[in-house]
Amino acid sequence: MGAVWSALLVGGGLAGALILWLLRGDSGAPGKDGVAEPPQKGAPPGEAAAPGDGPGGGGSGGLSPEPSDRELVSKAEHLRESNGHLISESKDLGNLPEAQRLQNVGADWVNAREFVPVGKIPDTHSRADSEAARNQSPGSHGGEWRLPKGQETAVKVAGSVAAKLPSSSLLVDRAKAVSQDQAGHEDWEVVSRHSSWGSVGLGGSLEASRLSLNQRMDDSTNSLVGGRGWEVDGKVASLKPQQVSIQFQVHYTTNTDVQFIAVTGDHESLGRWNTYIPLHYCKDGLWSHSVFLPADTVVEWKFVLVENKEVTRWEECSNRFLQTGHEDKVVHGWWGIH
């Protein structure tokens, strides 16, 4: 928008200068109605040509005589003067936008300085750049605009203060860090004092605090021992076998090859008296077989004789009892004898 206004101002100035030059040129030319020009200021009185005085010595119908050399020279000088005036006016009009821009820059800088909040310093780099632009712009235009002496001093003082700001801000940051460290240290001391000594600082005695501390230590020791004991018991329970291997053995000589010895009992692993578990023949009339039974369990059982898949003979004795326990066992019995 500023460029548009500048162009309008320049165009208007040039148009006005052109009109003024045309008006002056018309007024300086000889009259069209036969009016004679006034004599020039530097011309002698005798050399002014009167109207109708031609070289022939008489007027010829009111016609103006031919212009003399002196009149031509004076007209040329007049044209040069008016041309120079036009050029100077155009130069002045061309400098108007630049001067207006410089004035706007100065006004913006003053407004920026007035609107800076209290306790905050504007950016030193931007201030230095604007100051350099101000110093360069007036110099490039022949010193037409400069800061007053008081404002230059204020700018220099502000620049020096801004140059010293980083160190001062660093000192402030260090002071804040030190204060925060001290505050954190004090908080840690307060917490440790209250957690270690209990209510000593709240009206209690030192002996009471010692007793409470010892009691807490005893409680923690007991809980630790209890935890270890439970842990040991858990390990023992996990190491205890869920089943044990019981090997049943008996000496018996069968009469035929279709006969064999078996074992039965009240546990499901022994057939619950309805079925049987066959024993394998080894040698010399020894029959043997291993059965897995639950650990630490009491079962009732007996040897039986099986022929053609049927029980044909039971031991001639009461039921046998077995305590399985937690280890593998070998149960060796004699037929019919406990």
UniProtKB/Swiss-Prot annotation:
GO molecular function, one term: enzyme binding
Processing and modification events after translation: Ubiquitinated, which leads to proteasomal degradation.
Known tissue expression: Expressed at high level in glycogen-accumulating organs such as muscle and liver. Trace signals are also found in brain, kidney, and pancreas.
UniProt cross-references to InterPro entries, sorted A to Z: Carb-bd-like_fold, CBM20, CBM20_genethonin_1, Ig-like_fold
Residues of the CBM20 domain: 238-337
Primary location group: membrane
Gene3D superfamilies on file: Immunoglobulins
Pfam short name (any one): CBM_20
Phosphoserine, modified sites: 68, 140, 167, 179, 195-196, 205, 209, 212, 220, 223
Any Gene Ontology biological process: substrate localization to autophagosome
Transmembrane stretches, start-end: 7-23
Stretches of the chain forming a coiled coil according to its record: none
One GO cellular component term noted in the UniProt record for this chain: perinuclear region of cytoplasm
Cytoplasmic side: 24-338
Residue spans of biased composition, Low complexity class: 36-52
UniProt xrefs under CDD domains: CBM20_genethonin_1
Membrane topology: Single-pass type III membrane protein
The protein's role, per its UniProt record: Acts as a cargo receptor for glycogen. Delivers its cargo to an autophagic pathway called glycophagy, resulting in the transport of glycogen to lysosomes.
Subunit structure, interactors included: Interacts with the ATG8 family proteins GABARAP and GABARAPL1. Interacts with several glycogen-associated proteins, such as GYS2 (liver glycogen synthase), GDE (glycogen debranching enzyme), GBE1 (glycogen branching enzyme 1) and EPM2A (Laforin).
Protein name listed in UniProt: Starch-binding domain-containing protein 1
Gene: Stbd1
